[in-house]
Amino acid sequence: MKILQTIAEFGAHWGGITTCTYDLLSALHKQGGDVDLLTLLPKDSTDRLLGNGEEWIHALKNDSITPFAYSANFKRWLDINYSQYDILHTNGVWLYVHHATCVMARKLGKPYVITTHGMLYPDAIKRSYWKKWPLLKLCFHKDIMQADCLHATCKQEMEHIRAFGYKGPVAIIPNPMVLPTPPSAKRSPKGKKVFGFLGRLHPRKKVENLFYGLEMLKERQDECEIWIMGSGLPEYESFLKSEVKKLGLKNVKFLGFVNGQEKYEKLVQLSTLFVPSDFENFGMIVTEALSVGTPVMASLGTPWEELNKQHCGWWCDRTPENIAKVMLQVLDMSSKELEEMGERGKAMVEENYAAMQVANKMLQLYSWLLNDGEKPSFVYEV
């Protein structure tokens, strides 16, 4: 069983989609899976290709053109090498790489899988709809509807896939979490409580709600500080800094882009991570924070009801009032209470989201698609 996964770009700056794809593929190889990845080199000269030079990563010169990102290099490689693969699996929709993967699979009569990575959420489809509508009519509606399976990371995403109209099998397999090297940094038991955001700076992340929540703490503001970790749209970052200045907040720090082990060294120092986004398909940062014992507050636009069920955080509306309420709860919690909450989160991640367990589910899915085994319990049919 030989699998080809494809993705439009594989640069570190692409964020969660590339990271979770790399983590899954690495775990698949450790499980004995025969999986290759086909992608294009990053166009941004400041970006770098993820990975460590693995032979299974085929990164082609990036010759993509037009908003559709047509690539003659990608097409040429597929034309030459397609016959050696049993299943094709693409990560995402809307770009030529995704369409070409689906077309090639249909041409060969081989099964293909699409991991939608949240791109069929209503809010995601609405963004740049003027670009997506003609592409949907021309090719992507067919690509999606004729897929042998769509991969969703949570039940919420599957519901949006069904609402889109897809009636084929949907596999719910979470994004994998590679448990990090234990950070050397520690949360200060006696210092200020630290609240944080880590992710791409974009208006839909609603980072400003942290500032509005902090402003509501009034005289208790001095008991805490906020770390904003990430980069993104320059105009949005400027807006955030202007809001901090307008509100007169003195305890907000912008730390810039962090990744790798540095990310975990920062996360472990937080008293709580806040994810106040409009929506998140999965939200890798949630499992990353939980994996080092940091409680998380995530908005109802994320699929993280488990935070409430497992008592390792807060899943609630991301209004400034609710954020302020969570901040006050954390300020009133002892170090022991925070540590116990963090340990529950860490245990949940290790039990349900560890990369090797996720990779095993993906291998089960591939085997089932090739008529080798029973339908897995995580595959849902209409």
Language model region names:
Residues 156, 176:
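Carbohydrate-associated surface elements
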Residues 295-299:
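Short hydrophobic beta-strand element within catalytic cores of glycosyltransferases
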